Amino acid sequence: MVATTETTNIGKITQIIGPVVDAEFPSGKMPRIYNALRVEGKNAAGQDVAVTCEVQQLLGDNQVRAVSMSSTDGLVRGMEITDTGAPINVPVGKATLGRIFNILGEPVDNQGPVYTAETSPIHRAAPKFTDLDTKPTVFETGIKVIDLLTPYRRGGKIGLFGGAGVGKTVIMMELINNIAINHGGVSVFGGVGERTREGNDLYNEMIESKVINADNLNESKIALVYGQMNEPPGARMRVGLSALTMAEYFRDVNKQDVLLFIDNIFRFVQAGSEVSALLGRMPSAVGYQPTLGTDVGDLQERITSTKEGSITSIQAVYVPADDLTDPAPATTFAHLDGTTVLSRGLASKGIYPAVDPLDSTSTMLQAGIVGEDHYNTARAVQSTLQRYKELQDIIAILGLDELSEEDRLIVDRARKVERFLSQPFFVAEVFTGAPGKYVSLEDTIKGFKMILSGELDDLPEQAFYLVGDIQEAKAKAEKLKQD
């Protein structure tokens, strides 16, 4: 969706190299940087062509260089190109919920047009320092392992690390569900350079788990914006901004707490690198664009809390060749407030969510922010699990009987803690048959303190598996006893 000015400014295409389009405009009527240019007409075969480009460079001699947001197939030199007089605009507001959009804000889900008068440009300045909410506030998710060990910051940015099949999508959907029910918030998902199949699977899973209400889209809790792997680099580079623009409207105008998911932030950087090379810029370290820090900063600095509302962002991060010093993840890490690492080992044990309690980190886990009680409980849980991890080699070689009484007690409690970190999800009800549970932070801390203090040493460890709060674990133990 592109805005147009009343006085039409028309130029002519002079050169096309892949997704890069050069155009000449009349003297004194040059388009601004980031303006959307529109090409509409017929190609040599008589088929309709409609392409939107974004101005990236003013070359001199009345020439501009733009990057196309879709395929340039069918474009020829001499075709008319119109300056819309404004950046790319996308629809915003309640009408976007339950729908899938492309980079231009056009619906691509065969559900008909989007009826909204509200649109916003994808290029905007980050909020002013004076408008920011700088008080560190914990964002309660209702997921025990996250709230206790890697608390999310309201308006913070969290990196989600995990391979295929360990539960990234399910955690994302549960967060979307919980924020909608318990915070009155909404979510926006930006699929940046993701596989078309994955995007389709996510959409269908969200319909199945009622995150998207196919019968009444107004009751949906999420808007989806996709720029898939087969799209030109311009679209993949800008789709994150389109998703962010929709999220900003919910924060600034509707004054809501918003969850913004970006999958994958590495592909955003990769697309920027491709565009940079196409524009003839000298590559920087490892072939990345020289503007890497600026590109990432422009996106990340707009994701923040203001006095009106917050955007809390969960970003999937791919690490090339597991090299954390690669410029792409290294630049991203500088902006993150926490990391949630998913473990295949835990997933293989059937412990879901498979969040690694020892590898995951958060800047919020400080006594001065979360309080002494929360901090001490979290550290005690981690030290118990760490000791259990150290003892596993001895157990594997010599057996449990060779451990001291104290170590046996640690192993017993650690196994209970490990199982109590699991939790039934609302969005997984249709698959597991177990009703989902939202656990408050207060109940989470209370439960783990009781396990570590030894109050529940007489309960079997099965009682702690896939339950909500500690009262439910006690009830399950009673039921197991009767059976």
Swiss-Prot record:
Keyword Zinc-finger annotated: no
Molecular-function GO terms, alphabetical: ATP binding; ATP hydrolysis activity; proton-transporting ATP synthase activity, rotational mechanism
Pfam families: ATP-synt_ab, ATP-synt_ab_N, ATP-synt_VA_C
Reactions accelerated catalytically: ATP + H2O + 4 H(+)(in) = ADP + phosphate + 5 H(+)(out)
GO cellular component: a single term: plasma membrane-derived thylakoid membrane
HAMAP family registered for this protein in UniProt: ATP_synth_beta_bact
NCBIfam families linked: atpD
Assembly mode: F-type ATPases have 2 components, CF(1) - the catalytic core - and CF(0) - the membrane proton channel. CF(1) has five subunits: alpha(3), beta(3), gamma(1), delta(1), epsilon(1). CF(0) has four main subunits: a(1), b(1), b'(1) and c(9-12).
The name this protein goes by in its record: ATP synthase subunit beta
The encoding gene: atpD
